[in-house]
UniProtKB/Swiss-Prot annotation:
The lineage of its organism: Archaea, Thermoproteota, Thermoprotei, Desulfurococcales, Desulfurococcaceae. It comes from Aeropyrum pernix (strain ATCC 700893 / DSM 11879 / JCM 9820 / NBRC 100138 / K1). DNA-dependent RNA polymerase (RNAP) catalyzes the transcription of DNA into RNA using the four ribonucleoside triphosphates as substrates. One of its GO terms (cellular component) is cytoplasm. The gene is rpo11. Its EC number is 2.7.7.6. Gene3D superfamilies: RNA polymerase, RBP11-like subunit. Keywords: Cytoplasm, DNA-directed RNA polymerase, Nucleotidyltransferase, Transcription, Transferase. This is DNA-directed RNA polymerase subunit Rpo11.
Length: 99
């Protein structure tokens, strides 16, 4: 089963369907897309409450390389999560390893 499907609706307008995910990734992905590119509009919605499918809608002034935008957004999220992990582990170490 595919995990991701990109649909170009019209010039500069894309729908990214993500299977097996929910609001957690939807919120993170939209915010990351906004950070790494300059969309006119970016939001997501759950397809149905009983299905783990989200659709991310992104609109730009003109066509973009949406795969490159998603790569940059993924890199950004990995960087943020890595930074959080590093800070968390440093804090644990300062407290003597307890959590």
């Amino acid at each position: 089963m595919e995990r991701l499907r990109i649909i170009r609706e019209s010039r500069g307008s894309y729908v990214i369907q993500v299977y097996g995910e929910d609001h957690t990734l939807g919120t993170l992905l939209v915010e990351a897309i906004k950070r790494v590119s300059n969309p006119k509009l970016a939001y997501y919605e759950a397809v149905h409450p009983m299905e783990d499918i989200i659709q991310v809608y992104v609109k730009y002034e003109d066509d973009v390389d949406i795969k490159e935008v998603l790569r940059k957004a993924s890199d950004y999220l990995l960087e943020v999560i890595g930074d959080f992990r590093r800070r968390y582990l440093e804090a644990l170490e300062r407290r003597g390893g307890g959590g």
